[in-house]
Design a protein with these regions (language model features):
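Extracytoplasmic and endomembrane cell-envelope/extracellular-matrix remodeling and assembly machinery
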Residues: 1-155, 183, 228, 265-269
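Residue-level recognition of tetratricopeptide repeat
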Residues: 97, 131, 165, 169-172, ...
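Structural motif corresponding to the intra-repeat A-B loop/turn of tetratricopeptide repeats
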Residues: 102, 136, 170, 175, ...
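Canonical positions in the second alpha-helix
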Residues: 114-115, 148-149, 187-188, 222, ...
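Terminal, low-structured helical/coil segments at or just beyond the last alpha-helical repeat
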Residues: 208, 217-219, 223-269
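TPR alpha-solenoid repeat register
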Residues: 91, 125, 159, 198, ...
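Canonical tetratricopeptide repeat
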Residues: 94, 128, 162-163, 201-202, ...
């Protein structure tokens, strides 16, 4: 605390260099002298209190977070904040994201590949690469990047959803890829149970596999999350006709139908 007080007093002392009209009101009513700063510094030294060293890992993570946010929210400021030849992780990340935001495919790809090269075992850099590749239409490269991210972080639901999305929308994907996407998405339900995108993708994958009852069931799940009771009931009623009786999916469809009926009855009261 005392160290912070010394720092505060030194900042206020800078007011001495300013014209009186530009000095802070606090400084004009609380004049700071070199003696007061010296006295406080001496007391701090005699107290035996050691300054707390910053956690370098947290500081590094904070710098990375700031760089990523800067790239997404203020891409035009990146070149003012980081030198273009700065090869630190925050700088490379900021330039990769800024180029992506500015639709500069060549630079975005070059920078994100450099970022992955700096930390090849970081799943989130492979995830970012997958996102950049996908949005520039490079789906095979996106697929490889997301596959690597998922391998490094298999329990991350958001990575699994993004990977499944690429498997589903890629025209090169076959039935085995669609089944892999379904496996990924079903595995992600535990960590992302409120994701409407997850259920929409499941419906799309089952639809591509010509499994209409399951596609309808997951569309009903999506409608349920959106609090659309009539649509939930309609889709679940269509789904249950083709589901094996007493199967887990059949019982879930029954639950969704019951929810829709209860909602309808409540509105009539």
């Amino acid at each position: 605390k005392k160290k912070k007080n010394v720092s505060f007093l030194k900042k206020l002392q800078d007011n001495e260099l300013l014209p009186e009209t530009q000095q802070s009101e606090y400084y004009r009513t609380h004049p700071i002298t070199r003696n007061r700063i010296s006295a406080l510094t001496t007391r701090l030294a005699q107290s035996g209190v050691k300054p707390v060293q910053p956690n370098l890992h947290w500081k590094d993570q904070h710098n990375r977070m700031k760089a990523k946010l800067l790239g997404f929210l203020s891409p035009q400021q990146v070149s003012w904040t980081y030198d273009d030849h700065d090869n630190t992780i925050p700088a490379v990340m900021a330039y990769a994201v800024a180029a992506y935001q500015n639709s500069d495919e060549k630079k975005a790809v070059r920078k994100v590949e450099a970022l992955v090269g700096l930390e090849p075992d970081n799943p989130y850099y492979h995830e970012l690469a997958g996102q950049i590749y996908a949005d520039f239409g490079r789906l095979e490269e996106s697929r490889a990047a997301y596959a690597k991210a998922h391998k490094l972080r298999p329990k991350d639901g958001l990575i699994a959803i993004a990977y499944a999305h690429i498997l589903i929308v890629n025209d090169q994907s076959g039935a085995s890829d669609l089944k892999e996407a379904i496996k990924l998405l079903r595995g992600a339900i535990a960590s992302e149970p409120r994701s409407t995108r997850l259920y929409r993708l499941l419906a799309t994958a089952y639809g591509k596999l010509k499994n209409d009852p399951m596609a309808k069931l997951y569309l009903a799940e999506e409608a349920y999350l959106k609090r659309n009771a009539p649509e939930t009931g309609r889709l679940a009623s269509l789904a249950i006709r083709g589901l094996a009786e007493n199967s887990q999916e059949w019982h879930r469809a029954k639950d969704l139908i019951f929810y829709a009926e209860q909602h309808k009855a409540a509105k009539k009261r």
